[in-house]
């Protein structure tokens, strides 16, 4: 019996980079699932601002989780978080500045960056998050940092990625992830989707066998494999298709609805 569903967003519940809300048909299907007393967990690499509006759209009353920050939506209370230290934020900022790269860090109400790039512009619109541009990194560093990003052209990112990853991971307590062609995401080294969901399920005393999950990216594969019913889409990566117990039509066809209606 499925007690909980774990949902990736971009490429699963919605088309990649398509804004902060799901299509109306997907919204209604998710609400019907919630009416069956099935717990919904949103498990996205997006920053908080790109996930929270969706939780309100689908009338979520329980938990939202983007890996680095797990929020009880009903109580508006942080359950746990994986925080990048201020020293590491400063070190990464200085490294990016030295190499003339765009760099920024998350805050609960905004994102702070040294300059606007194409990648940051896409993120600003996709997550509906306000960007503050500054040369003074420490001025706006008021709360926990759950994610940093480095952004530049695809050519520059491809050129510097390997050496940048080695340098940053060797000197800071973080993990460097090639997120998109123009964006590098940086998170705490212990933060990943599987670890975060596992930690949440233990808190809630829910077994993985009672979980159904959906995802399309490589970071989703371990979650699908651990779940009682792991589902991917036709647009899913090979790693997801290898471990999924069910494959539904692509996100461009709202394939997740087939899965939601069968729960």
Where are these regions (language model features)?
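Asp-based, Mg2+/Mn2+-dependent phosphohydrolase catalytic module
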Residues: 226, 234-263
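Active-site phosphate-binding/coordination module
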Residues: 22-120
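Non-catalytic pre-domain segments flanking phosphatase-related domains
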Residues: 1-7, 35, 206
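Residue-level signal for inorganic ion chemistry
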Residues: 33, 44, 148, 197, ...
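Conserved acidic, metal-coordinating active-site core of Asp-based
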Residues: 95, 99-102, 106-214, 218-226, ...
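Asp-based phosphoryl-transfer active-site loop
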Residues: 3-19, 224
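Short, structured coil segments at secondary-structure junctions
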Residues: 57-58, 66, 172, 226-227, ...
């Amino acid at each position: 019996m499925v007690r909980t569903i774990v949902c990736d967003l971009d490429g699963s519940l919605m088309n990649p980079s398509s804004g902060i809300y799901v299509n109306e048909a997907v919204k209604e299907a998710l609400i019907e699932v919630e009416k069956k007393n099935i717990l919904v967990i949103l498990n996205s690499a997006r920053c908080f601002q790109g996930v929270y509006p969706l939780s309100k759209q689908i009338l979520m009353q329980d938990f939202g989780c983007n890996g680095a920050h797990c929020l009880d939506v009903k109580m508006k209370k942080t359950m746990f978080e994986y925080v990048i230290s201020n020293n590491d934020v400063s070190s990464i900022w200085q490294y990016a500045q030295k190499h003339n790269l765009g760099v920024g860090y998350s805050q609960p109400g905004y994102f702070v960056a040294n300059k606007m790039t194409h990648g940051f512009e896409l993120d600003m619109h996709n997550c509906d998050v306000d960007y503050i541009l500054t040369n003074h990194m420490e001025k706006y560093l008021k709360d926990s940092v759950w994610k940093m990003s480095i952004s530049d052209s695809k050519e520059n990112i491809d050129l510097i990625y390997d050496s940048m990853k080695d340098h940053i991971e060797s000197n800071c307590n973080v993990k460097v992830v090639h997120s998109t062609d123009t964006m590098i995401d940086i998170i705490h080294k212990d933060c990943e989707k599987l670890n975060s969901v596992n930690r949440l399920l233990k808190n809630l005393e829910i077994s993985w066998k009672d979980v159904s999950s959906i995802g399309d990216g490589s970071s989703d594969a371990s979650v699908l494999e651990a779940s009682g019913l792991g589902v991917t889409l036709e647009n899913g990566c090979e790693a997801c298709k290898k471990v999924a117990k069910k494959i539904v039509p692509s996100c461009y066809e709202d394939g997740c609805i087939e899965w939601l209606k069968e729960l």
